[in-house]
Amino acid sequence: MTERYAVFGNPIGHSKSPAIHSMFATETAQSLTYEAILAPIDAFEATFKEFVTNKGYGANVTVPFKEQAFALCDELSEQAKLAGAVNTLSVLADGKIRGDNTDGLGLVADLQRNLGSLTGLKVLLVGAGGAARGSVLPLLQAGIAKLSIVNRTQAKAEILAELFSSYGDVVSLPISHTGKSYDVIINSTSSSLSGEVPNISSDSITSQTVCYDMMYGKEPTSFNVWAKAQGAKQTVDGLGMLVGQAAESFNIWRKVRPSVEPVLTQLRAEL
């Protein structure tokens, strides 16, 4: 029987998830369907439950429903609990709903694909919203030496650093702090969508720094253009993170890990 999967969001028309999972299914010879479902802002839970009733096996969840998805789960992975949000829902054999968060795993996989091992690296995380929160534990588990978090509102960065303090060396700093350089700088904010750049000091970047923007587009993002102008060694956008988190979700559902590279190459060509 062909099993049914979907991505829920609002808006959702722009989603690349159906194309990604269709390519994964072809590559791994899995029989499934994957569609995009527009859920009303005030009716995510009802829309998802209708999907489950109609033989839905699993789903991805995007903006603005990740916290609502978290709330409806019967079981949660450790990563989902700490992220406070769910992007992957699985319908278990007993009908219970399990929630996972694969966003940070997708980020780490893409960083490792571009950099190799992350062990011992000093990382600056810009932003303290949901995307940042979902990334902290996977980064620490990948072996980074220290994670510094900055945010326009420093109190939010402080809360995040405190939440993960028992998992590794995590600190919060003023966004405009100077005198520190990093191996990797990750922009988790959506600043590039409006052509802006976070107010971080250019001396955070050296000729050995890799800068990563979670946003992506046909042209380099505004953050990556700025980082390159400051002399960054390498800039990477978030398209690989998108494909990586999808691969993690696919593996949770199908117990088979698809190859990211061919899908990423095709998506890049289609931007």
Curated annotation (Swiss-Prot):
The keyword NADP applies. One of its GO terms (cellular component) is cytosol. The keyword Amino-acid biosynthesis applies. GO terms for biological process: amino acid biosynthetic process; aromatic amino acid family biosynthetic process; chorismate biosynthetic process; shikimate metabolic process. Keywords: Amino-acid biosynthesis, Aromatic amino acid biosynthesis, NADP, Oxidoreductase. Gene3D superfamilies: Leucine Dehydrogenase, chain A, domain 1, NAD(P)-binding Rossmann-like Domain. Shikimate binds at residues 15-17, 62, 87, 103, 216. Its EC number is 1.1.1.25. The active site is at 66 (proton acceptor). Pfam families: SDH_C (PF18317), Shikimate_DH (PF01488), Shikimate_dh_N (PF08501). Belongs to the shikimate dehydrogenase family. Involved in the biosynthesis of the chorismate, which leads to the biosynthesis of aromatic amino acids. Catalyzes the reversible NADPH linked reduction of 3-dehydroshikimate (DHSA) to yield shikimate (SA). Homodimer. HAMAP family: Shikimate_DH_AroE. This is Shikimate dehydrogenase (NADP(+)). It comes from Shewanella pealeana (strain ATCC 700345 / ANG-SQ1). The lineage of its organism: Bacteria, Pseudomonadati, Pseudomonadota, Gammaproteobacteria, Alteromonadales.
